[in-house]
């Protein structure tokens, strides 16, 4: 059982823009939702979780088999935690007149071979190594229930988060972005908007590499499919790309890592099996060794940021 911790604050807020006029009606504009938890003894920099594809922020709160999610690991380590529901996801319902068209919801036949049980299929060479999905027979069903619509283009997803970026950073202050999968391009775009408010980026199996041709868009702007709305260089800060042993993202992540490394940044490509953490697929925050992965990420942040992420008093964090 994990040690308890004390919170000094928790809450949530919709990040709203100007109302949108479409189809002869007035609708809420592009909006996101951010939930936060602040431990009693907090580090000076927070962590912002950015979910992937058709997911939602709840995947960082609990695993599909009911264990504490990554949010709890980072809170126990003293980080204020912010969890984003990107526009059109989670608590921010998709509205086609505002968000544009959405892809059909993915079914079991598409997601199970890629996320839940790749070892039962032969879609990529490393799939047979996967053995970290929870044993709970309903874990896959709970994961499927969390999946919602997503934009038909990566550029649209990027523009959606850029629309809420100013309100987001005004609320949360200095932060470390922890993005996942198709939320990876959104994380780079947020860093370009946030500038020096983004201390570091931890990209968990981020989608894309320069020039990659994807059904949702070609990566023509570094690691994004569209030019950044912000002026900052998203890679001008410590960056880590994290890859599991049994995922289809290994080659793409290696190409993305080579690009970031060539920029001369403070960078590490964290291949989990090289740290004694093996058998993982794409949903690193959901699998049975998720807590060990979170500890590895915390250690990387501490090494990379040093005093900028120092812990004020370890005794005050634990309850």
Regions found by a protein language model. Name each.
Residues 134, 148, 155-176:
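Conserved acidic catalytic loop of the alpha/beta-hydrolase fold
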Residues 178-187:
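Gly/Ala-rich beta-loop-alpha elbow adjacent to hydrolase catalytic centers
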Residues 49-55, 181, 206, 244-245:
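Glycine-rich His-Gly loop
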Residues 41-129:
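Short, surface-exposed "cap/lid" segments of acyl-processing enzymes
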Residues 1-42:
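N-terminal cap/lid segment of alpha/beta-hydrolase-fold proteins
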Residues 277-279, 283-319:
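Catalytic active-site module of serine/aspartate enzymes centered on a nucleophile-bearing elbow/loop
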Residues 177-178, 201:
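Conserved alpha/beta-hydrolase fold motif
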Residues 206-271:
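The feature captures the conserved acid-bearing segment of alpha/beta-hydrolase catalytic domains
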